[in-house]
């Protein structure tokens, strides 16, 4: 039993051991499978990482190649642009060379043509003189008497003389002194003509034609063949008389023709055996330099005498030929050949401009680049500074040309006479301003500061050069004018601060310092009209009409400077009431002392007002000016007040 028992236990134990072994194998296999699976997963992950790394490397390589390609494209484009610029420069250089050659060829042809024409003029003058010398000795006295009478009739008709010529019958009965008397009358007539017409007046076409007829008649008389011996009653007259008369007549006609520029001045005068009558015109001033010119050492251009060296082109410095006079260009910078002027820049002296800007009033041409290259521009007349000239810089950065500088009003004390004259001007228009308030000149910064404190907000593109104040504020005014120092620098200017108080509706009028008297006066007239309106309680007017009436007053004041006469002040009040378009004379105009530039500047200021295209000042002036033209200043003012 015991053995059986033990036997059965052994079998059970063996089965257990077998089961345990089977379970261990299964677990071992499971673990093995898991390990294999994990290994395979690791391998897959490694492959994926390797593939990702490879893809990243490929992407980096592609990016690098793309960057290299972009760099190559940029380099190629840069080279293409440089090549294009090089080709453009070569084309421009070729074009410039071609233009230079073309210009030189044109100048050569012009010079050749001018030389030929000058030679023809000289040949014509010499031929005429030789003809006069050879033929004036071949005329008979009786036939010359007839011609003299015809000449006297034509000259008297030309000069509107009241005396009548000596008749043929009377002429024959006069002693040997008679022919000389007739010639003296003719010489006096020609001399009077030279005096009256040789001082800056252009001859009328009708007068030129008559003088040409006169020359033809003289030439006809000189070309006559020699006639039979003289009449018996004239045998006692010297054979020298007709010759002297012919030479006098020929010389008078030649001088007349020279005065019209039809023949050139010749150094060789017609020579005669006897004494010739002198027909020298009175001393005159050169139209260019204003110095005296001597008879025989000048050229007569449209009735004005010039030194030969003064009537030259400002661009090429060559004389302007007589046949080019009608086509030459003249402006404030000088005179020019028309061909030179079309290509000449007055700023940099460039003589071959391809494109140009042109000032609408001064008609001065300049290269467009000078508008933006820092070339100074006068704050008054708007002209650019030519090279080799020095504009003056004011303390606030504005530029002033030397012509405007000559009449500039520089400090507050200096402008007071103009202030008093302006009050007289307004009183003459029946618009007397009773209240007193200061008139101060200030720098640009002080004017801008006052404008802000006055709370003036201009919504238009305008340059403020004056302001009529209504509020109390502290103003820095120019108390001591600067003086011109070395190199046209302004030194010594002083300013002082003062408080303007409100004693009436106007506390002060401020205007930029350093402007010419004419421009300062126009601005003052404009601001004084604002003051007149405020002092009379006229506020909140239509802005366009208010600025328009102020511009009209400025324009009227400029008119008074242009047309003022010495006796106009006496009837200023009656003129204002009867005709508003005839302003009273301003006592400080001093028109007789004006320079040519001042006369041009007043026209420039008027032109600026008339051509202003701004929506308030320009439109306002044209609207109100038409109203004043159709009625009167006082009626226009009433209409403006009704339209507030």
UniProtKB/Swiss-Prot annotation:
InterPro entries: DA1-like (IPR045218), DA1-like_dom (IPR022087), UIM_dom (IPR003903), Znf_LIM (IPR001781). Interacts with ubiquitin. Residues 284-355 form the LIM zinc-binding domain. Ubiquitin receptor that probably regulates developmental process. This is Protein DA1-related 6. Residues 119-138, 181-200, 244-263 form the UIM domain. The UIM domains bind molecules modified by monoubiquitin or ubiquitin chains and promote coupled monoubiquitination. The keyword Methyltransferase does not apply. GO terms for molecular function: metal ion binding; ubiquitin binding. Transmembrane segments: none annotated. Keywords: LIM domain, Metal-binding, Repeat, Zinc. Residues 572-591 are annotated as: Disordered. It comes from Arabidopsis thaliana (Mouse-ear cress). Pfam families: DA1-like, LIM, UIM. PROSITE patterns: LIM_DOMAIN_1, LIM_DOMAIN_2, UIM, ZINC_PROTEASE. Residues 572-589 have a biased composition (Low complexity).
């Amino acid at each position: 039993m015991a053995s059986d028992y033990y036997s059965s236990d052994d079998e059970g134990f063996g089965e257990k051991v077998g089961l345990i072994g089977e379970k261990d194998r299964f677990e071992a296999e499971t673990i093995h499978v898991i390990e294999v699976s994990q290994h395979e997963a690791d391998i897959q992950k490694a492959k994926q990482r390797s593939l990702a790394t490879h893809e990243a490397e490929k992407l980096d390589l592609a990016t690098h190649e793309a960057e290299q390609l972009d760099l190559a494209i940029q380099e190629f484009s840069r080279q293409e642009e440089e090549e294009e610029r090089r080709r453009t420069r070569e084309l421009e250089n070729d074009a410039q060379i071609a233009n230079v050659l073309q210009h030189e060829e044109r100048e050569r042809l012009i010079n050749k043509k001018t030389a030929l024409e000058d030679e023809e003029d000289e040949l014509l003058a010499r031929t005429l003189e030789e003809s006069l010398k050879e033929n004036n000795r071949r005329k008979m006295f009786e036939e010359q008497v007839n011609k003299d009478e015809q000449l006297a009739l034509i000259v008297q008709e030309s000069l509107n003389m009241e005396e009548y010529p000596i008749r043929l019958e009377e002429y024959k009965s006069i002693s040997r002194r008679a022919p000389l008397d007739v010639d003296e009358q003719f010489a006096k007539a020609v001399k009077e003509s030279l005096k009256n017409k040789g001082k800056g007046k252009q001859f009328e076409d009708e007068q030129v034609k008559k003088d040409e007829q006169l020359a033809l008649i003289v030439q006809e008389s000189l070309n006559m063949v020699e006639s039979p011996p003289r009449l018996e009653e004239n045998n006692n007259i010297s054979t020298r008389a007709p010759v002297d008369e012919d030479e006098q007549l020929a010389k008078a006609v030649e001088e007349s023709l020279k005065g019209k520029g039809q023949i050139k001045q010749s150094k060789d005068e017609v020579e005669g055996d006897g004494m010739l009558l002198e027909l020298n015109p009175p001393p005159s001033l050169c139209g260019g330099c204003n110095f005296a010119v001597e008879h025989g050492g000048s050229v007569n251009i449209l009735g004005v005498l010039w030194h030969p060296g003064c009537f030259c082109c400002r661009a090429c410095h060559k004389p302007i030929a007589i046949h080019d006079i009608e086509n030459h260009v003249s402006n404030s910078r000088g005179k020019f050949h028309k061909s030179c002027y079309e290509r000449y820049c007055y700023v940099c002296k460039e003589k071959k401009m391809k494109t140009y800007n042109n000032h609408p009033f001064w008609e001065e041409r300049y290269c467009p680049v000078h508008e933006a290259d820092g070339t100074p521009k006068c704050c008054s007349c708007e002209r650019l500074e030519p090279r080799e000239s020095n504009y003056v810089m004011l303390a606030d950065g504005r530029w002033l040309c030397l012509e405007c500088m000559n009449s500039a009003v520089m400090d507050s004390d200096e402008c007071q006479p103009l202030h008093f004259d302006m009050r007289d001007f307004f009183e003459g228009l029946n618009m007397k301003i009773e209240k007193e308030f200061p008139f101060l000149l200030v720098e640009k910064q002080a004017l801008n500061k006052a404008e802000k404190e006055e709370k003036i907000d201009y919504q238009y593109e305008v340059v403020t050069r004056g302001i009529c104040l209504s509020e109390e504020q502290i103003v820095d005014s120019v108390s001591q004018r600067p003086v011109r120092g070395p190199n046209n620098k302004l030194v010594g200017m002083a300013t002082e601060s003062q408080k303007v108080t409100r004693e009436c509706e106007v506390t002060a009028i401020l205007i930029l310092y350093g402007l010419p008297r004419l421009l300062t006066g126009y601005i003052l007239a404009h601001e004084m009209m604002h003051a007149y309106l405020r002092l009379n309680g006229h506020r909140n007017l239509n802005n366009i009409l208010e600025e328009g009436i102020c511009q009209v007053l400025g324009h009227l004041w400029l008119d008074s400077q242009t047309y003022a006469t010495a006796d106009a002040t006496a009837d200023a009040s009656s003129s204002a009431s009867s005709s508003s378009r005839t302003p009273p004379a301003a006592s400080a105009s001093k028109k007789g002392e004006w320079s040519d530039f001042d006369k041009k500047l007043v026209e420039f200021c008027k032109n600026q007002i008339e051509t202003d295209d701004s929506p308030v000042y320009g439109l306002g002036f044209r609207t109100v000016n038409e109203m004043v033209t159709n009625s009167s200043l006082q009626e226009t003012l009433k209409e403006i007040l009704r339209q507030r």
